Every structure is written in structure tokens, then in C-alpha cells.
Swiss-Prot record:
GO biological process: tRNA 5'-leader removal
UniProt GO cellular component terms: ribonuclease P complex
Presence of the UniProt keyword Membrane in the record: no
InterPro entries for the chain: Ribosomal_Su5_D2-typ_SF, Ribsml_uS5_D2-typ_fold_subgr, RNase_P, RNase_P_CS
Subunit structure comment from the entry: Consists of a catalytic RNA component (M1 or rnpB) and a protein subunit.
PANTHER family reported in the protein's UniProt record: RIBONUCLEASE P PROTEIN COMPONENT (PTHR33992:SF1)
Molecular function GO terms recorded: 3'-tRNA processing endoribonuclease activity; ribonuclease P activity; tRNA binding
HAMAP family, per database record: RNase_P
Catalyzed reactions: Endonucleolytic cleavage of RNA, removing 5'-extranucleotides from tRNA precursor
Protein name in UniProt: Ribonuclease P protein component
UniProt family annotation: Belongs to the RnpA family.
Length: 122
């Protein structure tokens, strides 16, 4: 596994203020049936990921963990082609009934949308 394919701590949003910065003033948002993504340019020089998978949407821990693993893996594989933005991925109710392949496909659509956005300020 090359360095670009890893998912280190620096590629994650960990603090509340990092999440709030993206969610309160996103540069853009997009969504599909399963996920919603808010994004904002960062100064880190790399894309970073934050997850919002609430118990209110997925009641069972095993469901929440499965969805989080899928989101992280999809981001890890695609992060080399993404702009230097902070991404917060939230889930929608339909995610509970979807299989893994469907979720990966839905995330790929969202990452493709992110790659197609113009990078501001550079």
C-alpha cells in the first residue's frame, strides 16, 4: 500500500470545530439517496474526511460501523484525486437497506462530483 492510499489521522476531521466549520459554511453540498456531503476548502494540502452517522438513522451499532467502514474505505481509495477540502459525509435513512456494492457506487458518484468542482483560491 503506497503512502497515498493510507488513511492516517491527519486525513480525518476529529474536532467539533472542524465539523462545525464545514457544516455551518460549506462551499458546496451534494447528496444522493444514501449520503449527503458538505465540503469546504482547507489549508492542509490534503483532503480530510469527517463522518456523521447518527444512531437516529442507524439504530444498531453494527449497521453504523459497517457504513463508517465503507465510507472510510471509499475515501481512502479516492483521496488522491480529490481536492484539498474538508468533507463531512452524512447518511440518509435508505442506507440501512442498501448492500455494500450499492453504497460504494453511491459514494463514487459523490467523489466524482467533488473531483469535477473547481478549486477556489489556487
Amino acid at each position: 500500500m503506497s503512502a497515498d492510499e493510507r488513511f492516517p489521522r491527519g486525513a480525518r476531521l476529529l474536532r467539533r470545530r472542524e465539523f462545525e466549520g464545514v457544516l455551518r459554511a460549506p462551499e458546496w453540498r451534494t447528496a444522493n439517496r444514501y449520503f449527503r456531503v458538505s465540503a469546504r476548502q482547507n489549508q492542509c494540502g490534503r483532503p480530510r474526511l469527517g463522518l456523521a452517522v447518527p444512531k437516529r438513522v442507524l439504530r444498531l451499532a453494527i449497521q453504523r460501523h459497517r457504513v463508517k467502514r465503507i465510507i472510510r474505505e471509499s475515501f481512502r481509495v479516492r483521496q488522491g484525486g480529490l481536492p484539498d477540502h474538508d468533507f463531512v459525509v452524512g447518511v440518509r435513512g435508505a442506507v440501512a437497506e442498501a448492500d455494500n456494492a450499492t453504497l460504494f457506487s453511491a459514494l463514487e458518484e459523490l467523489w466524482a462530483h467533488a473531483r469535477g468542482r473547481p478549486c477556489d483560491g489556487s
